[in-house]
Regions:
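Juxtamembrane intracellular "pre-TM" segments in multi-pass secondary transporters
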Residues: 1-10, 192-233
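Substrate-agnostic recognition of the 12-TM MFS/MFS-like secondary transporter fold
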Residues: 12-28, 51-64, 73-83, 104-163, ...
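Short amphipathic helix-loop junctions that connect adjacent transmembrane helices
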Residues: 29-43
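MFS-fold secondary transporters
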Residues: 36, 89-93, 112, 186-187
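Small-residue hotspots at the loop-to-helix junctions and early N-terminal turns
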Residues: 39-49, 141
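A helix-boundary/kink motif common to multi-pass secondary transporters
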Residues: 40-41, 70-74, 101, 132, ...
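C-terminal ends and interior cores of transmembrane alpha-helices
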Residues: 81-99
Length: 245
């Protein structure tokens, strides 16, 4: 917590991450409740639960894209505004009955969750550049704690907002849009200070499959040094826990 007071850039990034993660979490459980209001609730809820899981499948791909992004601060800000626009569209769609509108909401929800992961990946190099090496572990740990707290409190806040608004899904989506808007606006104020090391493009571009295989082998060799058996099962368990979290 002392790091927040000592490092203004870290405090700013933490505030932005808090607003973005809270915004992403608020609608996740509300989305399932919205699905339950569909004409065929059992089918819709099943689809909604699957939709919430899907962004986790793109985590590696999104992370690699974030690493390769050159102007990270610019995209960090732009994406927050884009998410605000997406949730304004979601707010409008929730007023339209039927599965067509529900399908559009599902798609926009997937896109927004993937963008939140992308923003998280963009923040890491900025943190590494602006935070002393001896404080990096504390900063990363605080980020993980912040994400967990936002995930739990955000869903609770979403249900509470839904209850006091008498299931006004459009209102909750609009509040989500505001959180994303604020998340980017607070970064825009100090955009020039959000620096990072230059991104070096690889000499030869490998396919996504090749890079995933290389990443898998590197991770496997690391765990092999620690004498961890059944690495494949362990990796699957970690991905599943991350998705459920």
């Amino acid at each position: 917590m002392k790091l927040l007071a000592r490092n203004k850039i870290f405090a700013l990034l933490s505030l932005s991450r808090f607003l973005n993660t809270l915004g992403a979490a608020i609608y996740n459980l509300v989305f399932v409740v919205f699905a339950a209001s569909m004409p065929q609730p059992s089918l819709a809820v099943g689809i909604a639960n699957l939709i919430v899981f899907i962004p986790s499948l793109f985590t590696i791909f999104v992370g690699m894209k974030a690493d390769r992004t050159k102007k990270k601060a610019n995209w960090l800000i732009r994406i927050g505004y884009l998410q605000a626009i997406l949730f304004i569209l979601i707010a409008l769609m929730t007023k339209i009955p039927g599965f067509l509108a529900f399908s559009i909401v599902c798609f926009l929800n997937i896109v927004s969750d993937c963008l939140s992961d992308y923003r998280g990946g963009l923040q890491l190099p900025i943190m590494k550049k602006n935070i002393p090496d001896q404080d990096l572990m504390e900063a990363y740990s605080f980020n993980q704690l912040l994400s967990m707290v936002c995930s739990i409190s955000g869903q609770a806040l979403g249900v509470w907002l839904l209850a006091i608004s008498h299931q006004n899904f459009a209102l909750v989506a609009s509040i989500n849009a505001v959180t994303f808007l604020l998340s980017s606006t607070c970064l825009l104020i100090r955009k020039k200070q959000l620096t990072h090391d230059p991104v070096i493009e690889p000499k030869s571009k490998n396919s996504l499959v090749h890079e995933c295989q290389e990443m898998y082998q590197n991770a496997k060799s690391i765990f092999a040094d620690e004498e961890v058996h059944h690495f494949g099962k362990l990796l699957f368990s970690l991905v599943l826990i991350n998705a459920l979290g």
